[in-house]
Amino acid sequence: MKIYPVILSGGAGTRLWPLSRAVLPKQLLPLVADKTMLQETALRVSGLPGLMAPLVVCGNDHRFMVAEQLRAAGITPLGILLEPVGRNTAPAVAAAAHYLKSVDPEAVMLVLPADHVIENREAFKDAVLRAAEMVKGGGLATFGIVPKSPETGYGYIRRGAALAARDDCYQVERFVEKPDLATAQAFLADGGYYWNSGMFMFAAERYLAELAKFAPEIAAAADKAVNTGYRDLDFCRLDEAAFTACPSDSIDYAVMEHTQDAVVVPADIGWSDVGSWSALWEVQQHDENGNAKRGDVYLDGVKNSLVRAESRIVAVVGVEDIVVVETQDAVLVAHKDQVQRVKQVVDHLKSKERTEHLHHTRVYRPWGHYEGIDAGDRFQVKRITVKPGEKLSLQMHHHRAEHWVVVSGTARVTCGDKVSLLSENESTYIPIGMNHRLENPGKLPLHIIEVQSGSYLGEDDIVRFEDIYKRS
């Protein structure tokens, strides 16, 4: 049996704002350890026996960061499937199943969200091996987390009869929506309920057969999206029209609640979905006062709090049970019991057409990154870093001119028909409407300061004539 991890790396980046943003959601952030959650998930399965290289499903906007993070972790994926739009887990996994069937008709899928914490790797390995036994018998396995507290933020799985093959795995009696506190307390006391982890294992063929039975529109749309998709560099793009037409639904609703072959594998693995700042506090290391801190932080008389500084010193004095998260352009201060209201902050930013929910001041691109330094009426200043050997697209702007000053490194600059090399402390000017390109031909990062001036300075004022990353 060959088991293929399918890592779901979607997400909108709302619950852990201001650190998580739309273009940099939590799975791409180093929240708990030095590695990002995506990297931790990929590394978690890389050493397990019988597991193949992972297949990653992500959104189009995250593709280069996903590929770069996997490369940095030493992981070579089987493939990276690009969703043109988010359609929840059932279509994403259906697309992955069709892709895997073309590689291995007998493929078994281990479906894992990219943004979960699993502290006990040995227990996780044991749960995977038990699930594999259930899949051999035709079961569709879901991993049920042994509850430690009466959580109201998770759905639950009620176990049924023990299975003949293993008495530590069970039929699924029913799935239960997120309960109120009293119901959650009753579930905990009962002992027959598990948290619904959103992790699954099943044969690709079995999942598609059950999906065709219970959600045929999803099955057909996913099939078409894969078959009419195409390769793009190291990515596989799902057909946009077919996938956009696919109904949105979760695996639980589309398949698991209806199939007669659902089994639950209890897992006591130190699991958290890190769905809020309070959940992150729970899984982080604490000091003697119960505080989880990261960055340049000063605490005095603070207890049971999470304090995180990204760009400057943060001092907190004489408070308890709070969350303080500082970034370059936004700061969150909240009581630990109220962090779910962060989504209302994000909704407010959207309604005011602000950008702090979309991206940080540092924005990553496949060639490197840029960072906003200053902005005002008709001008904008950026710090641009280009990785060795990389180049920006050949482009032009209708509404702005640009001045470039090389801080360090060597720049190859195309401006119209002229190509020149610039070194440290040298500069150039790009007029409005002029074709231009910036490249780093050296072996060290290129750092430049860019001053834009003009009537409109939005990132959408760009016409690309040539791009090695095939962006439009």
Tell where the protein language model's regions lie, with residue ranges:
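Short coil/turn connectors at secondary-structure junctions
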Residues: M1-I3, L51-M52, I75-P77, D104-A107, ...
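Conserved N-terminal catalytic core of the sugar/cofactor nucleotidyltransferase
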Residues: M1-I7, T14-P25, P30-P113, V117-A123, ...
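Left-handed beta-helix
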Residues: M1-K2, E205-V405, T410-Y429, H436, ...
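Fold-independent oxyanion-binding glycine-rich loops
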Residues: G10, G59-N60, P84, L112-A114, ...
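A short acidic, often aromatic-flanked loop/helix-cap motif at beta-alpha or helix-coil junctions
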Residues: G86-P91, S149-E151, L181-T183, W271-S272, ...
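A residue-level structural signature of the nucleotidyltransferase/glycosyltransferase Rossmann-like core
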Residues: M109, E173, G192, M199-F200, ...
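Conserved core of the sugar-phosphate nucleotidyltransferase
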Residues: N120-A245, V263
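Noncatalytic nucleic-acid binding interfaces
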Residues: I448
